[in-house]
Amino acid sequence: MSKQIQIPDIGSDEVTVTEVMVNVGDTISVDQSIINVEGDKASMEVPAPEAGVVKEILVKVGDKVSTGTPMLVLEAAGAAPAADEPTAPVADAPTAPVVATAPTASAIVEVNVPDIGGDEVNVTEIMVAVGDTITEEQSLITVEGDKASMEVPAPFGGVVKEILVKSGDKVSTGSLIMRFEVLGAAPAESASAPASTSAPQTAAPATTAQAPQAAAPDTTAQAPQAAAPDTTAQAAQSNNNVSGLSQEQVEASTGYAHATPVIRRLAREFGVNLDKVKGTGRKGRIVKEDIEAYVKTAVKAYESGATAQATGNGVANGAGLGLLPWPKVDFSKFGEIEEVELSRINKISGANLHRNWVIIPHVTHFDKADITDLEAFRKEQNALREKQKLGVKITPVVFIMKAVAKALEAYPRFNSSITEDAQRLILKKYINIGVAVDTPNGLVVPVFKNVNKKGIIELSRELMEVSKKAREGKLTASDMQGGCFTISSLGGIGTTHFAPIVNAPEVAILGVSKSSMEPVWNGKEFAPRLILPMSLSFDHRVIDGADGARFISYLGSVLADLRRLVM
């Protein structure tokens, strides 16, 4: 009896399949890893929920999947195979690769990007050259998306006649990448790819090798609107149909803009002059996000009555914000320079941080907490547990988490999120706290659930386990969702104070710096006390300055006297 196996609960986000770890015909056992998936800064292996024989694999490397997505068909061990079970993937299988068969004549056939999800990805490597003889499933190009890279295989064999992409190009599902001369293939009158496994000789003109093309077989006629190589013809098309923005923003481009035809079409639809947009892609290429950010900024400026006084390039230059343009400086005139590409995580986190900093009106309060007694108690408990060989080490962060949870109960406005229209407040009845963890792969913020209901030892053990998972890159999407408040601790590195940026949609964040001994007047004399510097940043739309002061003062009092945690 065959059974369809689905992706288990991995959170609400889509993830990318980075490796298929079994083959059709394999006999697998319970909990054997089937596929590897990777989300935003986290990867995991998906185990088999039951044993059996793999009859069909429904996903491939590069597919976007989420909870409930079918990934393979499993036949229970010892079950008789179904008599009418097909021996090859049928043409309408949504995710099964389709392979060309039984060609009848030599022809030029187009090769398109298979189904890799809805996002655009970067071409990072061309793995073949014109004239190469390619076999089926041989890797053609390497593409890289958000924290995941994959190789795009050849759907059929042939000789490479033309390569239509280069390193740095943005491609997506259905993008034309190469043309093959296929010996014995039926002539392709348009952009039709190789025929599917069913009826190869009669279905060739109408059935393509890849699902994205099935809805549009005549892609030759649509080439000016698709991601085709003819950028010259694409760039020369008229801009007379644009409307909606200022004359300066919609005027025809007078210079060369580094953008693909699909981006040029998007710019025309929005009425954007590409000369005004700064590209953030590889080698300054303009990508979809640049267009969206430019339009969003221009619309905000229009709605607020502001006028762009600058003619700089895009959001980074203050376009639409009434700011002076970003200065263009030839730094090489002053000495030797080196220009390096920002990492993908730098670009992604930078965009989020910039959005949060620009949209959220930040206020930061600074204060100090006396943690002399807390630190003495912590060291005493660690020494006791070391003797008992319990394998649990209590860190200052755990006490700070408990103190923050107590403060969130006392000041529930800090445990909220503002709606998108900034008209209502969502008060949360749970307390989940995110803790920033520095890892070799970058900064991640795992979320600890129901901190107010857990004890110091339980939280310490959980912190150790989660930190290990973070360093090994094994955090799942659900591990980093649902936060109410974030703690960013630089105590192990240094600094006295810093101003952390609120992690939207949260409304506050606590920055913790390095503690040090300071003389404190106790009414009779100066006594050495261990002092912890704290920085509280909050959204001023939600929290007043007075409430911010009350929150951080209350937090300091709890850290100074742990007895308040049980009250």
Swiss-Prot record:
N6-lipoyllysine modification, residue list: 41, 147
Entry annotated with the keyword Plastid: no
Positions annotated as active site in the UniProt record: 484, 540, 544
Composition bias type Polar residues, residue spans: 239-249
Biological processes per GO annotation: pyruvate decarboxylation to acetyl-CoA
Residue span(s) of domain Lipoyl-binding: 2-75, 108-181
GO MF: acetyltransferase activity; dihydrolipoyllysine-residue acetyltransferase activity; lipoic acid binding
Any one Pfam family match given in the protein's UniProt record, by short name: Biotin_lipoyl
Listed Low complexity bias regions: 192-238
PROSITE patterns assigned: BIOTINYL_LIPOYL, LIPOYL, PSBD
Protein's recorded name: Dihydrolipoyllysine-residue acetyltransferase component of pyruvate dehydrogenase complex
Organism (species): Haemophilus influenzae (strain ATCC 51907 / DSM 11121 / KW20 / Rd)
